[in-house]
UniProtKB/Swiss-Prot annotation:
Name of the protein described by the UniProt record: Endoplasmic reticulum chaperone BiP
Sugar-modified residues: N464
Location, primary (coarse class): endoplasmic reticulum
One GO process term, biological-process aspect: response to unfolded protein
Regulation: The chaperone activity is regulated by ATP-induced allosteric coupling of the nucleotide-binding (NBD) and substrate-binding (SBD) domains. In the ADP-bound and nucleotide-free (apo) states, the two domains have little interaction. In contrast, in the ATP-bound state the two domains are tightly coupled, which results in drastically accelerated kinetics in both binding and release of polypeptide substrates. J domain-containing co-chaperones stimulate the ATPase activity and are required for efficient substrate recognition.
Positions that bind ATP: 45-48, 104, 234-236, 300-307, 371-374
Residues covered by region (Disordered): 642-670
Any GO molecular function: heat shock protein binding
Compositional bias segments (type: Acidic residues): 647-663
Record region (Substrate-binding (SBD)): 407-507
Organism (species): Yarrowia lipolytica (strain CLIB 122 / E 150)
Range of residues in the leader sequence: 1-26
Region (Nucleotide-binding (NBD)): 133-287
Length: 670
């Protein structure tokens, strides 16, 4: 499929103009700002959450009722009450089946997703399938209840809202919430739904590394800088490469693994000690949720200690069957158990550099975000990758994301001091539709700044086609069948016309939250249909996103050949149809050639189309090109006679016939 993309400079300028009304103080309507009140910024994390607010040009990260500025993303149900945060986590070991954590690993996903199935094996609480989606089952007040991941997340968001309301002394109704950069549309939609359940209007979903870059960039806005944000949290990992200059934050590329973080490191240690304990005592503690819960709590503490010490002792009284647990964990052993996971974090770093075309020596700063970046080995590997360049430690890795979210919240609510900030985020996967031959025609490329809008004209594939099917895909492969179907709809009522004549304008609108709206508009009749891709349309899981990018690289040569073959086929088919139509045009070419020449051309076109029908699947790119040359060899001498025969010597191809090197323009067919 041939289509042109605007230069990045034009895209950047257009997006800057597009974004300013949303992000500058002047662009927010006064009435809207008044109705917003104070907008808060929330980092809804896998293991911990954090909330901030901007007042008077300064960001405050708010402490909870325990005096801590980070709150565990835990929800627990007892016989009498529901607990959220520290209170829930503190009783987890004694109430493992009714204490919910890591809910971010389930939100927006399907029950049958591989990652969900892998995770629920390790959760002490029960997860069951309800209408294809995972729900948690708890027992409270003498009865069993089920909750969706959105509901559990809403309980955590409500806790963060309450912290802000206690600080502000007034009601809070609007928020900016962060998500991992590689969260897909379903996960983003589910996060917004959680906000609604919590009584919050989520004005903007912001990618976590982008939010962290805002926190970093406020003090570094003079000269242009390329920075890598390395965000390794409790359950997810993101890397983004950004350009910051004069308050403009442009995301150049993003990559990551939404299933890699501190909890995975903990699990390796837990697995090691469980195996050791079972062998030593000839028991099996794997099925005892309370025992594993106690070990999980202490292993997390030990991991934190090892960031500043070379070894630590783990002591647990009445660990199992009255026996105590006492083992030493060294930093060296912790690193040995997790070294492959640590090294795995470097692959997305390589990916963003490759995608953006930036060399690692041109990176000005590396910003560390997330508690897991405190692990010395992680810092060492990253420093080695960047040839000795040390990471910036000017911001608190636990609070940076909430800080950036609070700044963005301040922008949206018209706070002083943030008028000049412009945020240019990107979409993680290419978006397009299926066209003739099963090819995915791209409309919005991967790593395009959002919000963005892209339109392209398509046409019908057969004569008198009254309906076109618009199938929307995301992914990096040439053929749509190898990508992920997001949704489909039909545009009906197209008036009868030869193939290629109707003009169907397809428009993709991707908003600042990464949510997609697709419209098909028949320019002839004015009819249009629209679909918004929401969380029930089956967006991708994180593993599928990584697989698509890897497969796209692995099969790049194969994909290129397939695309070239289909283009050659389409070129031949359109050339033949264009020739037939113009021979039939009595006011044009058809009225200027002899009956014998007309018959010769029609016979050649008919033979070509019959050959196409018989060989379209098996023929190679070269076959299609040779067939087109053969048809052109018959057509060219006939059309040349027009100009040699006294038609005024006009070389403007009067009559509308297009020679081989001046092919009739045509739109991709639906």
């Amino acid at each position: 499929m041939k289509f042109s993309m605007p230069s990045w400079g034009v895209v950047f300028y257009a997006l800057l103009v597009c974004l300013l009304p949303f992000l500058s103080k002047a662009g927010v309507q006064a009435d809207d700002v008044d109705s917003y009140g104070t907008v808060i910024g929330i980092d809804l994390g896998t293991t911990y959450s954090c909330v901030g607010v901007m007042k008077g040009g300064r960001v405050e990260i708010l402490a909870n009722d325990q005096g801590s500025r980070i709150t565990p993303s835990y929800v627990a149900f007892t016989e009498d009450e529901r607990l959220v945060g520290d209170a829930a986590k503190n009783q987890a070991a004694n109430n493992p089946f009714n204490t919910i954590f890591d809910i971010k690993r389930l939100i927006g996903l399907k029950y049958k997703d591989e990652s969900v199935q892998r995770d629920i094996k390790h959760f002490p609480y029960k997860v069951k399938n309800k209408d294809g989606k995972p729900v948690v089952v708890v027992e409270t007040k003498g009865e069993k209840k089920t909750y969706t991941p959105e509901e559990i997340s809403a309980m955590i968001l409500t806790k963060m809202k309450d912290i802000a309301q206690d600080y502000l002394g007034k009601k809070v109704t609007h928020a900016v919430v962060t998500v991992p950069a590689y969260f897909n549309d379903a996960q983003r939609q589910a996060t917004k739904d959680a906000g609604i359940i919590a009584g919050l209007n989520v004005l903007r979903i912001v990618n976590e590394p982008t939010a962290a870059a805002i926190a970093y960039g406020l003090d570094h806005t003079d000269d242009e800088k390329q920075i890598v944000v390395y965000d390794l949290g409790g359950g997810t990992f993101d890397v983004s490469l950004l350009s910051i200059e004069s308050g403009v934050f442009e995301v150049l590329a993003t990559a990551g693994d939404t299933h890699l973080g501190g909890e995975d490191f903990d699990y390796r240690v837990i697995k090691h000690f469980v195996k050791q304990y079972n062998k030593k005592h000839d028991v099996d503690i794997t099925k005892n949720a309370k025992t594993i819960g106690k070990l999980k709590r202490e292993v997390e503490k030990a991991k934190r200690t090892l960031s500043s010490q070379m070894s630590t002792r783990i002591e647990i009284e009445s660990f199992f069957d009255g026996e105590d647990f006492s083992e030493t964990l060294t930093r060296a052993k912790f690193e040995e158990l997790n070294i492959d996971l640590f090294k795995r974090t470097l692959k997305p770093v390589e990916q963003v550099l490759k995608d953006s075309g930036v060399k690692k020596e041109d990176v000005h700063d590396i910003v560390l975000v997330g508690g897991s970046t405190r692990i010395p080995k992680v810092q060492e590997l990253l420093e080695k990758f960047f040839d000795g360049k040390k990471a910036s430690k000017g911001i608190n890795p636990d609070e940076a994301v909430a800080y950036g979210a609070a700044v963005q919240a301040g922008v949206l609510s018209g706070e002083d001091g943030v008028e000049d900030i412009v945020l240019l985020d990107v979409n993680p996967l290419t978006l397009g539709i299926e066209t003739t031959g099963g090819v995915m025609t791209k409309l919005i490329n991967r790593n395009t700044n959002i919000p963005t809008k892209k339109s392209q004209i398509f046409s019908t594939a057969v004569d008198n086609q009254s309906t076109v099917l618009i199938q929307v895909f995301e992914g990096e492969r040439t053929m749509s069948k190898d990508n992920n179907l997001l949704g489909k709809f039909e545009l009906k009522g197209i008036p009868p016309a030869p193939r290629g004549v109707p003009q169907i304008e397809v428009t993709f609108e991707l908003d600042a939250n990464g949510i997609l709206r697709v419209t098909a508009h028949d320019k002839g009749t004015g009819k249009s249909e629209t679909i918004t891709i929401t969380n029930d349309k089956g967006r991708l899981s994180k593993d599928e996103i990584e697989r698509m990018v890897e497969e796209a690289e692995r099969f790049a040569e194969e994909d290129a050949l397939i695309r070239e073959t289909i283009e050659a086929k389409n070129s031949l088919e359109n050339y033949a149809h264009s020739l037939r139509n113009q021979v039939a045009d009595k006011s044009g070419l058809g009225g200027k050639i002899s009956a014998d020449d007309k018959e010769a051309l029609n016979d050649a076109v008919t033979e070509t189309l019959e050959w196409l029908e018989a060989n379209s699947v098996s023929a190679t790119k070269e076959d299609f090109e040779e067939k087109k040359e053969a048809l052109s060899a018959i057509a060219y001498p006939i059309t040349s006679k027009i100009y040699e025969g006294g038609e005024g010597g006009d070389e403007s191809n009067d009559g509308g016939f297009y020679a081989d090197d001046d092919e009739a323009p045509f739109h991709d067919e639906l």
